[in-house]
């Protein structure tokens, strides 16, 4: 299949620049993957589509305020750092701009000197391996000095950092939010549980590979970046129990979906596991664990658009996307949602 098979026209004004004030009042496009039928709802109506046998699987990762503005110690020149991946306790793979000022041995300072850094090596695709020096707790310093690493298509400043976190976020380590989860409120989750639906949590730390474009013509040649995931025993038991009782495993977001499909065996069973995944799901892939998916609207020609096409069929998805554009749904991270059932 070609990348151009996943292109669609998206007017720029449909790219959501800020989150909804009330998370669960975003719009919801419901797509029946068997018939291609479409319904237009509000996100909190998701409750009507869930049954007591179902299980919702949510990614509890938390976004690090991973964008740091600092200065070169020697010259005072302004620098921008974006933390990508923790290699060791105080060592990170980092994107540094401007790169020419970040040679091995270069030292940098942030804030009033409470955080310092040194380039100790070169990483993949122009990234740098950076060691940080500080007193106290790194996460607390980062929380104080760092900014949210918003996707490149969001031009407006985010007033409240928590609006780019899910209400159930817990495990720090992502460079981007698992955005399908942003639509849930504490109240909606409570109602879902009261209906008898099981909630199961896993972790996948979202990397910036999420926003990297597919640069090859044939999608089979594309290589994904790896991301860290973990699933505990309790979550595995809830999912396996749901399958045994004939219920649906509903992934909240493509990150939960990719983790489930990484861990799942041929029979659709999962187990406690952690590791790194570079799974790439595109049409032709047979889902083992995931029965339904709650997700946002994705970029043209993106790997995530290919993932949803593998679940619902390319024609159904491209038709639904054209309808969404026509009906002026809001797209991408802060946009509206889709439920593929």
Swiss-Prot record:
Function: Transfers and isomerizes the ribose moiety from AdoMet to the 7-aminomethyl group of 7-deazaguanine (preQ1-tRNA) to give epoxyqueuosine (oQ-tRNA).
Coiled-coil annotated residue ranges, if any: none
Reaction it catalyzes: 7-aminomethyl-7-carbaguanosine(34) in tRNA + S-adenosyl-L-methionine = epoxyqueuosine(34) in tRNA + adenine + L-methionine + 2 H(+)
SUPFAM superfamilies: QueA-like (SSF111337)
Assembly and binders: Monomer.
GO CC annotation terms, alphabetical: cytoplasm
Designated gene of the protein: queA
Gene3D superfamilies associated with the record: QueA-like (3.40.1780.10)
Keyword vocabulary terms for this entry: Cytoplasm, Queuosine biosynthesis, S-adenosyl-L-methionine, Transferase
Entry's Gene Ontology molecular function annotations: S-adenosylmethionine:tRNA ribosyltransferase-isomerase activity
InterPro entries (alphabetical): QueA, QueA_dom1, QueA_dom2, QueA_sf
Protein name according to UniProt: S-adenosylmethionine:tRNA ribosyltransferase-isomerase
Family per record: Belongs to the QueA family.
GO BP terms, alphabetized: queuosine biosynthetic process; tRNA wobble guanine modification
Keyword Ribosomal protein set for record: no
EC identifiers of the protein: 2.4.99.17
Compartment annotation: Cytoplasm
Pathway terms, separated by semicolons: tRNA modification; tRNA-queuosine biosynthesis
UniProt keyword annotation of Transcription present: no
Pfam family for this entry, one: Queuosine_synth
